[in-house]
Amino acid sequence: MIIAVDVDGGDYAPKEIIKGALKAAQEYKIGLILLGKKEVIHVHAGHYLKKLPIEIVHCPQTVTFNEHAVEAIKGKPQSAIVIGTSLVKQGKADAFISAGNTGAVLAAAFFILGKIEGVERPALGAIITTRPHIPSLLIDAGANAECRPNHLDEFAHLGNIYAKQVLGLENPRIGLLNNGEEEAKGTKLTLETYQLLKKSKLNFIGNIEGHDISLNKADVIVTDGFTGNIVLKTLEGLGDALLKVRKVGHAIDSAAHLRGRALLADVGLGSMVKGMDFEECGGACLLGVKGTIIVAHGRSHARAIKNAIGLAKRTAEKGVDKLIAEDIKSRTKAGTEGDPKNVNTPV
């Protein structure tokens, strides 16, 4: 298993990215391809380069966060994002992860890897944990701001496969994020999506509301990328706030007359806080392209990068992209639900 890592992307690059990658190589027993400035990688990786199965690919160009995604990909072919994605395309890497410009990573995946046949809108699937040790998948977490009903139906099928393979769920519960549980509530988008999901063979449980996310009512939470990204960032912000409370300790102490650590252990808050920490999962997987691409958070530290690499490893080992392709073919052949002819309706 070889994972390509962009060491140029992220607020704390390259030091934290390289640090996390080295930890991943040791813990997961995998090979790495580090993409970035060769001399910089040597400075931060040091003697580990001789001890671990690591290859360095020099990338003289860097895509910054404020660059236009498509222009950056076309104008900087020697950037880590372009080269890393190309390595996956060529079969020289099993997966690629980046904490850099998300739009550029998505654009590179679309143009270089291409979409799986039958998929119109690849989507970001983000694993979230609001209850201790009970993960769920939020899709789309930010790839598609504007969607049509058939897109959300497509996201549900992508998420269903990912939840089965990576989360280990036998029959994932699919919930449509809405402003009410009733079938007749919502926008034109959610109303029409509801009917598509209702007709599908998925384990569709109906609409779920925002508060249902923390109750783990659904295993796969389906929504458009605009809403999904707001939900994700809100949960991340809450997680950050709880982490700060946990670190301070005396804030809980004064309210409960207990040592903060004791209270956390008693009510299981520590496990919940850990689960809501975005660094615990590491990143979101781009589902629907021909390969494994993990988008890490821009403010990832070493732990997040290590966990993102672990997620990439699990995803690639399961062959999720190939299973998605097989699922589309089987549904098309059956002539029942999710026919790509219906999915590829012009926007």
From Swiss-Prot:
Q: Which GO terms describe its molecular function?
A: phosphate:acyl-[acyl carrier protein] acyltransferase activity
Q: Which SUPFAM superfamilies match?
A: Isocitrate/Isopropylmalate dehydrogenase-like
InterPro entries xref list: FA_synthesis, Phospholipid_synth_PlsX-like
Q: Which GO terms describe its cellular component?
A: cytoplasm
Q: Which domain of life is it from?
A: Bacteria
In its keyword annotation, does this UniProt entry include Glycosyltransferase? no
Alphabetically sorted, this entry's keywords are: Cytoplasm, Lipid biosynthesis, Lipid metabolism, Phospholipid biosynthesis, Phospholipid metabolism, Transferase
According to its UniProt record, the EC number is: 2.3.1.274
Tell whether Glycosyltransferase is among the UniProt keywords: no
Q: Which reaction does it catalyse?
A: a fatty acyl-[ACP] + phosphate = an acyl phosphate + holo-[ACP]
Listed under GO biological process in this entry are: fatty acid biosynthetic process; phospholipid biosynthetic process
Similarity annotation: Belongs to the PlsX family.
Q: Subunit structure of this entry?
A: Homodimer. Probably interacts with PlsY.
Describe the task this protein carries out.
Answer: Catalyzes the reversible formation of acyl-phosphate (acyl-PO(4)) from acyl-[acyl-carrier-protein] (acyl-ACP). This enzyme utilizes acyl-ACP as fatty acyl donor, but not acyl-CoA.
Provide the protein name.
Phosphate acyltransferase
What gene is this protein translated from?
Answer: plsX
